[in-house]
């Protein structure tokens, strides 16, 4: 299960990380977020070279605002601390995997 991070440790966990990080911006009340969660869990188990983290937009408004999160779920791919890709809304597993793999 991806680690939950927030305003206090986003920089260390994502921006200072070398390699690929998938950040799942979500909220506990969001239906599509609940649907995508098990897919993210599966991908984390399959893709050992990628770091997966989750940010609750209600608990971490600073990070959500910094990255312009308007709708959830929003998935952001970071590589070596740079935001290289973003998708909004529910996607099937294979599309999320392809999104990540193009930055590996």
Task: Label each PLM-derived region with a short phrase.
Residues 1-51, 58-104:
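Proteins that catalyze or organize thiol-disulfide redox chemistry
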